[in-house]
Amino acid sequence: YQPAAKLILLNKKWRRGKDDGFDIGTKTGFFKTKKQLEKPNPEDPIQNIMLYTYDTSDVLYVQPIKSLGLTEEGVVTMQYALEKAIEQLYNIEPVEIDARLMGSDEYKNIMLYESAEGSIGVLKDIARNPAKLRGIFLKAYEICGYDYATKEDLFPTRPKASYDDLLSY
């Protein structure tokens, strides 16, 4: 847990783009199209940039233990299940808590952060109360369709950890 951490969110490329960065005219500040890149205007030199934004927020860094044997998809599922569990147990809106995958390509970790304006104190409460942290993990397990105590499949006819279970778009 880290209170008031500085978060930097980097936008590396266009969603459907292949190349990193964004080409802009250094005089106009306008983004350049592929057509404009083919015939550059010497009056408006082109520069490739990366866009970023930053914020200050409380964060909680979760490192799934290797013995879980989670694939990247498993860590992503855990990420969304933890977010959903926190939302439900703390009765907060989905926009008030967020998470990002971090770490190496071979071993991903989860960084949860409060995305509401100012601190809402949820992550601080979870970090300082091991019983609440355990409750979050138990709720996440339930959200994925299992009873932790009995290892029972709560919904045998439904897919586990489905879009409907984990996301709220």
What are these regions (language model features)?
Residues 1-169:
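Extended, highly charged accessory segments
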